[in-house]
Amino acid sequence: SEPRLFVRHKFSKQKSKAKLVRNLEWALDIDKVTEAIVEQGRCAISGRPFVYKTGSIDAPSIDRIDSERGYTPDNIMFVGAHINIMKGRLDLETFVNLCKDVAKFRSNEFG
């Protein structure tokens, strides 16, 4: 299906970048990752549904839980592309706490 093709294409490129550019371990099976992402259907952090379109802020992305480690089954979660960019190298607890601070500080502006 279209979501599966999108995910397979995107992560074959990410695998090459991880290995060649970043010299990171890649111990993921693309078929298993693809099925897991499509089954999950939404960002593990924000809960927003995945959008299977290049350039979408909600396109699925593989986040490394521990940014010092590679792409292994015990070190990944599936998140939206912009959540992954925003989180960067932060651990999940720090990222969520920062988001809470921003939401609290800006709550008067956006109701």
Say what each PLM segment does.
Residues 1-44, 72, 90-110:
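Contiguous alpha-helical segments
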Residues 24-33, 42-81:
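Histidine-centered nuclease catalytic patch
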Residues 52-53, 86-89:
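Short, non-ligating residues that shape and space the ligands of small metal-coordination modules
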Residues 68, 83-86, 105:
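Hydrophobic alpha-helical segments
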Residues 79-83, 97-100:
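Short, low-complexity, polar/charged sequence segments that are solvent-exposed and flexible
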